[in-house]
């Protein structure tokens, strides 16, 4: 089924708030497995019914804390992988939510997304701009099923001064590509690495890049793509042996940590404005770029009242529809993304081949008690339901509903009615007083 396409037809299916206390007890972005949503908060993983938001199972206490919970849980081979701090990963059974193993303590924060490939997971640690962090590989095999606290040692690790922050990897059969921090926002000291997937041995590296690489590496049609805090989008050609080819860069005009989405020679990415990362009026924008064999260029950009810091989602559900009545499919795609400012909702952009301008629309605005900053990516199930969280510690499910109210009028027999808040379709409770 298709995702919601207007603020009138999107409705909140449910919203569940965990009993989080403090930023270090925030919940992770959601992970969908079958009919359930999995999130972690503090030292626990919660399995929730995705139709109701009810918690149906809670894990045993994990060995560490999920800390700021910016990275979702990862899943592979019947296991959930949680980043519990101290440079450690804890594996739990997705069925029983009991511990299977805990990786060796490397120190620092585990802030990079986990990548799985052929029985191994990969992620990185960050300590500070001036101290080393490690990118490391772990076998997911549970060598001793009789113990839940066995220590899993790294298959390999690769160290870099400045470490790895939000640096998700692309894994092929034989090489792994990931980026590093550089210790300075606009210096030529970050590195794009390609290492042997099995041994961690260096295959190639690029050092001519500006700014921290704080995005996951996207692969498409022989190229890898990523953004930097120095304000660049890069495209790097990949050779079959894991070495790098030609590099194309585009100056976005502001910092970017959003993982780029690449589709049919278009690239979609969120960009921080120059007026302050947390200032809603800071000049933030969402960019649509064109790519060709010769390089990258801007198709257009749209203003957003907040920094679109997380990866967008692209929907092709309506790509074959004819919206302009010319008898041909328009090729329209829909982009959905969050932004790191109040009220912490969702924006949407439509794009078609050759489009040179556009306007982002507010798709969903949380009710007041659910409003907060948001650095979370969106998660979508096969029914088109959107799941996400913001810093209010609410996990929300949003679906399409063709029936909606665009206004409500209350008329007393005498006097006048005062509403406690302005009517909006997403708000379900109001207090009315007759004066």
Segments the model singles out, each with a brief description of its role:
Residues 1-27, 31-70, 74-435:
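Extracytoplasmic/lumenal domain signature
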